[in-house]
């Protein structure tokens, strides 16, 4: 059974997220007041492509693997959502179904805000609209950067950029002096 309360570490991950920490205390309070906690084991399905958008989600612990399935049936990992990151809002805004699958990568804790509560918070806080616009603008900039990289960088350079991103997000010092880092996320080579 899910523990309905975030651990201290999970709460800290949510509160220290770059976007969430920029919100006013009253908006953060209302979001957290409406959120429910769900815990998943490695590989647990969080949301499936084609599902109606019922929840806005934040990763509090572990990671969420966002993927798609190719025509041949192969799972393709698009990204990993790290603790402190919110997602799933696009489908709530446009009313379309989920576009990708989301799975727990390792033991994962998420926060979920029901679609109805999300809309109530939007109605109560005009600041929330502006914050969501900033969040979407940052995502669009990231997407343009990815498209540019795909069209201008060789595979080696794209791989190097991805490794740097993973170290920034999941890096763990592997030597006592911190001179080496390892990625604290179990990945298969093809991912």
Question: Across the structure, where does each feature detected by a protein language model lie?
Answer:
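Phosphate-/nucleic-acid-contacting segments
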Residues: 166-191
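Cyclic-nucleotide recognition modules
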Residues: 27, 79-137, 141
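Cyclic nucleotide-binding regulatory module and flanking cytosolic helices
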Residues: 1-42, 91-92
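Cyclic nucleotide-binding regulatory domains
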Residues: 19, 44-107
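Residues that recognize and position ribonucleotide moieties
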Residues: 21, 38, 57, 79, ...
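N-terminal positioning helix adjacent to the helix-turn-helix/winged-helix DNA-binding module
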Residues: 151, 155-158, 162, 188
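Transmembrane helical bundles of ABC transporter permease domains
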Residues: 144-147, 151
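Amphipathic, well-packed alpha-helical segments that form the structural scaffold of globular domains
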Residues: 32, 36, 137, 141, ...
């Amino acid at each position: 059974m899910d523990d309905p309360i975030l651990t201290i570490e999970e709460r800290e991950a949510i509160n220290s997220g770059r976007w969430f920490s920029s919100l006013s205390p009253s908006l953060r309070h209302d979001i957290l007041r409406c959120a429910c906690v769900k815990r998943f084991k490695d590989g647990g399905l969080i949301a499936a492509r084609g599902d109606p958008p019922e929840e806005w989600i934040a990763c509090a612990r572990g990671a969420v693997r966002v993927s798609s399935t190719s025509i041949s049936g192969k799972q393709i990992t698009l990204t990993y959502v790290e603790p402190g990151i919110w997602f799933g809002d696009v489908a709530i805004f446009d009313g379309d179904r989920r576009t990708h699958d989301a799975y727990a990568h390792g033991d994962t804790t998420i926060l979920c805000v029901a679609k109805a509560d999300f809309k109530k918070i939007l109605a109560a806080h005009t600041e929330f609209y502006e914050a969501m616009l900033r969040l979407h603008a940052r995502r669009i900039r990231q997407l343009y950067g990815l498209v540019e990289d795909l069209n201008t960088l060789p595979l080696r350079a794209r791989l190097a950029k991805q490794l740097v991103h993973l170290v920034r997000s999941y890096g763990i010092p592997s030597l006592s002096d911190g001179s080496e880092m390892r990625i604290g996320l179990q990945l298969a080579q093809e991912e």
